[in-house]
């Protein structure tokens, strides 16, 4: 069920990050070197989740693995225990909560009209539902972390924290962000561009679906304009 996926990606997945933040407060802040294996594992896990996204054919699985990859960055930023790292982790959890929930919602609107989640069978929607394509584009741009979104601000804070801690981590971070952009564009182009494969009449998007998307993306844009609300 789509509601379960949206709540899982937006709220429950972030509770793990919150738990790590509370747990790290009990540990010494001066000995971050002993957490080196965990930071490397978190970044490596993010890259592996991103690579898994690239080979997904199921739309919902792709979005789910995307959430996992972003949480790898969050965990790495929290473990370093600097103010910038914690601010970036908190901002990324909030930003990606909105983004992944919106993507799951869009995947469901596509599934209701095509009755399939296979990427190659859902293409050509920009000809049939142009407004849906606009929502897809906005959600994917936020997933890629393009400026001036909150996703960009949070990833910039996390990158600065990790680079300041160990400059070598920029290789893993850069690779992770490159793959994120690749699978996000692949997801958008696969579902929206190309000739449509649907022979039946597709019903238009309902007002409730537009409202649901607006309630995801408008608050995120507003927080992006004033990030000090959460950072």
UniProtKB/Swiss-Prot annotation:
One of its GO terms (molecular function) is ubiquinone binding. It is found in: Mitochondrion membrane. This is NADH-ubiquinone oxidoreductase chain 4. Its main location: mitochondrion. GO terms for biological process: ATP synthesis coupled electron transport; electron transport coupled proton transport. It comes from Cerrophidion godmani. Keywords: Electron transport, Membrane, Mitochondrion, NAD, Respiratory chain, Translocase, Transmembrane, Transmembrane helix, Transport, Ubiquinone. InterPro entries: NADH_UbQ_OxRdtase, ND/Mrp_TM. Core subunit of the mitochondrial membrane respiratory chain NADH dehydrogenase (Complex I) that is believed to belong to the minimal assembly required for catalysis. Complex I functions in the transfer of electrons from NADH to the respiratory chain. The immediate electron acceptor for the enzyme is believed to be ubiquinone. It is a multi-pass membrane protein. The lineage of its organism: Eukaryota, Metazoa, Chordata, Craniata, Vertebrata. Its EC number is 7.1.1.2. It holds the Pfam family Proton_antipo_M. It catalyses: a ubiquinone + NADH + 5 H(+)(in) = a ubiquinol + NAD(+) + 4 H(+)(out). One of its GO terms (cellular component) is mitochondrial membrane. The chain crosses the membrane at residues 1-21, 34-54, 63-85, 89-111, 128-148, 169-189, 211-231. Belongs to the complex I subunit 4 family.
